[in-house]
Amino acid sequence: MTGGNEILYGVCVPSRPLTAEPASQVVGIREAQRLQTRARVFDAAVAEFGRSGLAGADVAAIAATAGVARGTFYFHFPTKEHVLVELERAEEAKIVAALDTRTAAPDDLLSLLTLLVRHVLAAEERLGPVVFRDMLGLHFSATRPVGDELGEHPLAGFVVAAIAAAQEAGRVSRDADAGELGVIFLTGLFALLATGATASRERAALLDRYVLTIVQGMEER
């Protein structure tokens, strides 16, 4: 029966409609369990990377820490590099969210990009130097997952939008490609961060000079 009334022992009783709710609940529970397992694997992998680095990280150890079979790791992440790519995108999203609350003028590239660098350095402190450098190193590695382009990352989107705003304000040439300029800026920044000494005044000064040089090169004369 799908509705209406039933006659039970001479009494008219509304029948209970048959619905798909139980099946939906089962699917919802399974999806929640899948996401919880994935999160455990992700957290265990990041912790292992912090101890051993990407190259030295043991997938079996990651799986054991997460309490899953080795194959479960590969079910959620095809390679160890995929974990770092996801971590990078999550960190970039945090940085962009923080930058969206900025007080600097939208076309003030120097202030915006300097602030961006400060947030990236804060991310380095959160993640630790080993994970941070491995994450940045993927941008220059042949093992970077196919299809993960820097220009499609949240941070790149923010930088490109900032350059485009400066173009609209007449501070950067409209003939320049904002997308290309954004990728050039971030590629250079990541290279400096991946190869330079960590947590030093000299590096902070170098990064400030880098931002100034890039912005001056973009600006209209």
Model regions and ranges:
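Basic, helix-initiating cap at the start of DNA-binding domains
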Residues: 1-52, 56-65, 82
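Hydrophobic/aromatic-rich alpha-helical bundle segments in the mid-to-C-terminal region
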Residues: 130-136, 149, 168-212
